[in-house]
Amino acid sequence: MASKMSLRYSLFLIFFSLISLQGFAKKTGDVSELQIGVKFKPKTCEVQAHKGDTIKVHYRGKLTDGTVFDSSFERGDPFEFKLGSGQVIKGWDQGLLGACVGEKRKLKIPAKLGYGEQGSPPTIPGGATLIFDTELIAVNEKPAGGEEYGGDEDDEGYGNDEL
């Protein structure tokens, strides 16, 4: 009798622990797939980013707890790289494809498309989901030239309540 109760109690604890862990992962903001949210888009898209293009991007990188680990906005110096060439983390190569010059995106990047299980010590822990607020400044040296539409900067723009 005591062993049956002990077994039931153990099963209850295991079940409760699994439920708690699932809730904790969701609360921390971790994601398993790349999530792209368009925060702002120009009225017309004159220049769009494609694989092989050299792009300039302003960004702010954060952990899911809100800790900022890097920001070109604060430095006043956008980052330049060749899109799709592996010069940056995979989440950037995938998350900025198709963006228009002047477009602002929020990228939620899972560890597998970021710095993986090893992280990038000391600022980025292993297994970290990364959040980047990005603004595409130029594609192949072509800056924005079109009119911007009056989007709401505070609007998440995801179309997905999970973000």
UniProtKB/Swiss-Prot annotation:
Phosphoprotein keyword on record: no
Assigned keywords, A-Z: Endoplasmic reticulum, Isomerase, Rotamase, Signal
Domain of life: Eukaryota
Function: PPIases accelerate the folding of proteins. It catalyzes the cis-trans isomerization of proline imidic peptide bonds in oligopeptides.
Any one cellular-component term (Gene Ontology): plant-type vacuole
Region (Disordered): 142-163
Signal peptide positions (record): 1-25
Annotated PPIase FKBP-type domain residues: 52-140
EC code(s) of this entry: 5.2.1.8
Subcellular location: Endoplasmic reticulum lumen
Disulfide bonds: none
Catalytic reaction equation(s): [protein]-peptidylproline (omega=180) = [protein]-peptidylproline (omega=0)
Compositionally biased intervals (Acidic residues): 149-163
Protein name: Peptidyl-prolyl cis-trans isomerase FKBP15-2
Protein family: Belongs to the FKBP-type PPIase family.
Extent of motif Prevents secretion from ER: 160-163
GO process annotations (BP): chaperone-mediated protein folding; response to endoplasmic reticulum stress; response to fungus
One GO molecular-function entry: peptidyl-prolyl cis-trans isomerase activity
Membrane-spanning parts: none
